[in-house]
C-alpha cells in the first residue's frame, strides 16, 4: 500500500472521548521492546509458513521482477526482521507520521459539532520539526521472460504473470478495467470459462489491474495441477491473443457492462464505502469526475476500442 492508514468507527456521542486516543497513537507511539520482539517472532513464523506456499513464492517473485528492490518489490527474509531495531522505527515514525503527511477523511453523520471536535483534536498542538520522508519511485519495464521456482515435491503449480501497466491517472484506465473484467475479472470471465469450466485445470483463476501512486501493473494468477501447468499457460496466452485479434460479441460485452455497473453500485452502499471511493481518487490526485468518466466508459466503450487496447 502507498499509505499507512488508521480507521476508527465510533458513535457520535463517543467522538470527544476516542479521538484523543487516536491522536495519541499517531503522535506518541513508543514501540516497546517487548512488543517489537513479539511482532518480529510472529512475522518470522508467518514468513516461514508462507515460504512453503506456491502462491506466496510466485507473488513475491513476480513483484520483485517488475518493481526490483524498491519497497514495492523487495523480498523480505527472516534475517531482515532480526535487524529491525526500535530506534529505526522511532526515527521513521517521527519523520513520516506528522501533520503535513496526514489526511483526515470523515464519513457519517458529521455536522458542525463533530467537525469542531475533529479540529480541536487534530487542528492544533501537533508539531513536528523532523525532516519529512518523501518516497517516490520510478520503474523500467522488465524484459519479458519466465522464472521457474522448482519444488519437486509440490502437486500444484502457482502461476502469476503480468507486467507494468497504466495507473488510475491514465485516461485509458477505465477501458483497461473493462478489458480486464472480460479476461479474468469476474466469475463469468474468459479465463474462468476456459481454464476452470472447460479444461478443469483449476478451481479459480483471475486477473486484475492495480493502481499505485507511482506505477500500475496487470497480473493473472491461478494455481493448477503440476502436470497441466504448461497446458494452462498455453490456454491463458490463447485467451489474451483472442482479445487482441477478434472483436468481442455484443452479448458478452453487455454482460460485463451490467456486472461492472452493478458492482459499482454495490460498492456505494454506505458512508464508509463512499469514503473509500473518495480516498482512491484523492490520493491519485483526481476528483469525482473520475467516476463519472468510469461509468461513461463502461456504458459506451466499443468492441473495437477494447481490441485496440
Where are these regions (language model features)?
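Charge-rich, well-structured scaffold segments of protease-associated domains
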Residues: 1-131, 167, 197-309
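Phosphate-proximal small/polar/acidic motifs at interfaces that engage nucleotide phosphates
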Residues: 192-193
Amino acid at each position: 500500500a502507498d499509505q499507512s492508514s488508521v480507521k476508527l468507527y465510533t458513535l457520535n456521542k463517543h467522538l470527544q472521548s476516542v479521538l484523543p486516543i487516536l491522536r495519541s497513537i499517531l503522535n506518541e507511539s513508543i514501540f516497546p521492546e517487548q512488543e517489537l520482539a513479539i511482532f518480529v517472532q510472529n512475522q518470522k513464523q508467518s514468513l516461514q509458513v508462507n515460504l512453503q506456499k506456491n502462491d506466496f513464492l510466485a507473488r513475491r517473485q513476480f513483484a520483485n521482477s517488475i518493481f526490483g528492490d524498491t519497497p514495492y518489490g523487495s523480498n523480505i527474509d527472516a534475517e531482515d526482521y532480526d535487524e529491525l531495531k526500535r530506534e529505526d522505527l522511532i526515527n521513521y515514525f517521527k519523520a513520516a507520521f506528522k501533520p503535513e503527511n496526514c489526511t483526515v477523511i470523515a464519513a457519517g453523520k458529521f455536522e458542525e459539532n463533530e467537525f469542531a471536535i475533529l479540529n480541536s483534536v487534530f487542528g492544533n498542538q501537533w508539531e513536528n520539526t523532523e525532516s519529512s520522508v518523501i518516497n517516490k519511485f520510478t520503474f523500467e519495464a522488465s524484459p519479458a521472460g519466465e522464472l521457474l521456482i522448482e519444488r519437486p515435491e509440490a502437486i500444484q503449480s502457482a502461476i502469476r504473470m503480468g507486467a507494468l501497466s497504466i495507473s488510475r491517472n491514465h485516461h485509458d484506465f477505465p477501458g483497461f478495467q473493462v478489458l480486464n473484467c472480460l479476461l479474468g475479472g469476474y466469475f463469468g470471465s474468459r479465463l474462468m470459462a476456459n481454464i476452470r469450466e472447460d479444461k478443469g485445470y483449476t478451481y479459480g483463476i483471475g486477473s486484475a489491474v492495480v493502481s499505485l501512486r507511482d506505477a500500475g501493473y496487470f497480473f493473472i494468477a491461478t494455481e493448477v495441477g503440476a502436470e497441466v501447468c504448461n497446458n494452462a499457460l498455453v490456454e491463458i496466452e490463447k485467451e489474451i491473443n483472442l482479445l487482441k485479434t477478434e472483436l468481442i460479441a455484443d452479448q458478452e460485452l453487455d454482460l460485463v457492462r451490467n456486472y461492472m455497473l452493478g458492482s459499482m453500485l454495490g460498492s456505494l452502499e454506505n458512508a464508509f464505502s463512499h469514503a473509500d471511493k473518495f480516498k482512491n481518487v484523492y490520493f491519485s490526485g483526481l476528483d469525482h469526475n473520475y467516476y463519472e468518466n468510469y461509468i461513461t466508459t463502461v456504458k459506451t466503450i466499443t468492441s473495437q476500442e477494447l481490441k485496440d487496447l
